[in-house]
C-alpha cells in the first residue's frame, strides 16, 4: 500500500474521507471474486507450514492416487463441518467428486451432496452473477448420477428468467475471464440434463461476447478483464494472469465435455482450446509449473499452483478425450504433475496457491486455498486416466 503525502492525504479537504470510503465500498461490491470471498475457511497462508511430503510425481496410478489422497484428506478435515455457496468452493466440490471416484472414497461425494441438500440445491444470492452460479456445476454432476427434478428446480428458475434478458455486447454479463469457468459449464450442463438447447445457445452467445472483449488473437491468452487490456509487465510484455487463463482452460474443458459433438459452434471452442493449450505449453516453467504472470516469469520467482493445476487438468482432459495429441502434450502434463506433487506438504497442505485476487501477486510458499485444492484434485483424476499403466 502506498503512503500518501501530506498534501494528498486521504483526510485532506481535497479528498474527503467519506468520498474515498464510498468509492472503496463501490469497488469492493463490483469486483467479482473479491467482495464475497472472505470466508476464513477458504484458506490461509501460515509462515511455517512444515516440511514437504516428498511424494512421487510419477505418472503411475498408485502414485497419483497417493498424492490425491494426501491432499483430499487434509482439505476434508478442514471443511467437513462447513458449507458454502461461494465461488471459491465450486472447484473444491468438483474436485471432491472427482476424488471420490478416483480414490473410491464416498465420503467426499457425500460431503458435496450434504452441502447441496442443506441449501436445497440453491445458488448464491446475486441472481445474474457468474460467481454465484458456479456451485451448480457440482449439483449437475450429482444430478447426472441420481436424477431428481428437485435438484434442478432452483437453477432452471433462475436461468429461465435470465434467458429473457436481451444480450448486450457493450455490457458483457461475463466481463472477467474467471467467469468462463464459473457460469458456462452450468448452462451447458443444464442443457444436457434437460435436453433444452436454449441454455446452450445462451451460453454460446455470452462466451463469444466475452471472448471478443478479452481474448488476444496474437498471444492466444485472455486478459483478466478490460482494465488489463493495456497493462504490461516490468519487462514490457502484456500482463496475462496464469490463474485467469487456467480458469478459462478448465472452463473450456468442462464446456466441451458437456457440449454435443454435433453442436454447430463446437469447432470454435476446439480452436480456442487448441490455441491456448499450445501457447500455455510454451510458457511452462522448467519446474513444470506456471508463474502468476505468464509473460514475465522472471518477475515471479515462485510458481503458482492453482493456475498450474487448472492448466494441467485441461491438458490432461484434452489428451484423455482425444481433443489434444498425446505425443505433443504428454511431456507438459508429466512435468506439470510432478511440479504440482512437489507442492504438497507432509500433512497434505497444497502450497503456493495465490490468494484471491485479479492479477499476479506475491504469496508465501504455504499459501493454500480451496479453489487450488479443487483444481489439483480435478487434475489428479484426468492425469490418472492417461497414466502409464492405463490402456491407450
Predicted stretch roles:
Residues 3-22:
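Bacterial N-terminal signal peptides that target proteins for export
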Residues 19-31:
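Bacterial N-terminal signal peptides
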Residues 41-90, 97-118, 122-136, 142-157, ...:
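CBM-like carbohydrate-recognition segments
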Residues 32-42:
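Signal peptide processing junction and immediate N-terminal pro/mature segment
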Residues 80, 104, 120-124, 147, ...:
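Helix-capping and short linker residues that terminate individual alpha-solenoid repeat units
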Residues 177-181, 188-294, 300-312, 324-355, ...:
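Extended ligand-binding clefts on enzyme/binding-domain cores
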Residues 152-184:
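Asp-box/WD-like beta-propeller blade repeats and closely related beta-sheet repeat scaffolds
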Amino acid at each position: 500500500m502506498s503512503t500518501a503525502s501530506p498534501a494528498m492525504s486521504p483526510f485532506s479537504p481535497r479528498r474527503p474521507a467519506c468520498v474515498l470510503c464510498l468509492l472503496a465500498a463501490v469497488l469492493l461490491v463490483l469486483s467479482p471474486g473479491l467482495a464475497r470471498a472472505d470466508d476464513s475457511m477458504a484458506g490461509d497462508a501460515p509462515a511455517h507450514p512444515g516440511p514437504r511430503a516428498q511424494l512421487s510425481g510419477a505418472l503411475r496410478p498408485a502414485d497419483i492416487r497417493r498424492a490425491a489422497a494426501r491432499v483430499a484428506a487434509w482439505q476434508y478435515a478442514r471443511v467437513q463441518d462447513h458449507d458454502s455457496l461461494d465461488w471459491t468452493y465450486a472447484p473444491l466440490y468438483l474436485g471432491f467428486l472427482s476424488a471420490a471416484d478416483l480414490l473410491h472414497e464416498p465420503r467426499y461425494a457425500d460431503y458435496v451432496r450434504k452441502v447441496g441438500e442443506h441449501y436445497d440445491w440453491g445458488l448464491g444470492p446475486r441472481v445474474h452473477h457468474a460467481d454465484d452460479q458456479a456451485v451448480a456445476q457440482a449439483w449437475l454432476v450429482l444430478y447426472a448420477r441420481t436424477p431428481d427434478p428437485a435438484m434442478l428446480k432452483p437453477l432452471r428458475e433462475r436461468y429461465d428468467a435470465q434467458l429473457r434478458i436481451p444480450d448486450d455486447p457493450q455490457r458483457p454479463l461475463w466481463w472477467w475471464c474467471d467467469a468462463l469457468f464459473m457460469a458456462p459449464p452450468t448452462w451447458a450442463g443444464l442443457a444436457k440434463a434437460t435436453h433444452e438447447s436454449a441454455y446452450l445457445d445462451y451460453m454460446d452467445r455470452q462466451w463469444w461476447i466475452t471472448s471478443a472483449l478479452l481474448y488476444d488473437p496474437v498471444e492466444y491468452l485472455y486478459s483478466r478483464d478490460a482494465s488489463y487490456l493495456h497493462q504490461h509487465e516490468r519487462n514490457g510484455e502484456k500482463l496475462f494472469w496464469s490463474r485467469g487463463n487456467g480458469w478459462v482452460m478448465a472452463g473450456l474443458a468442462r464446456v466441451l465435455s458437456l457440449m454435443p459433438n454435433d453442436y454447430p459452434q463446437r469447432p470454435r471452442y476446439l480452436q480456442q482450446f487448441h490455441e491456448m493449450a499450445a501457447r500455455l505449453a510454451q510458457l511452462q516453467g522448467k519446474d513444470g509449473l506456471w508463474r502468476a504472470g505468464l509473460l514475465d516469469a522472471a518477475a515471479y520467482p515462485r510458481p503458482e499452483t492453482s493456475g498450474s493445476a487448472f492448466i494441467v487438468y485441461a491438458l490432461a482432459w484434452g489428451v484423455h478425450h482425444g481433443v489434444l495429441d498425446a505425443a505433443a502434450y504428454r511431456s507438459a502434463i508429466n512435468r506439470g504433475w510432478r511440479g504440482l506433487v512437489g507442492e504438497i506438504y507432509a500433512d497434505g497442505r497444497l502450497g503456493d496457491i495465490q490468494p484471491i485476487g485479479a492479477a499476479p501477486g506475491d504469496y508465501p510458499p504455504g499459501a493454500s486455498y480451496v479453489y487450488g485444492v479443487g483444481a489439483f484434485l480435478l487434475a489428479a483424476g484426468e492425469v490418472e486416466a492417461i497414466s502409464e499403466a492405463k490402456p491407450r
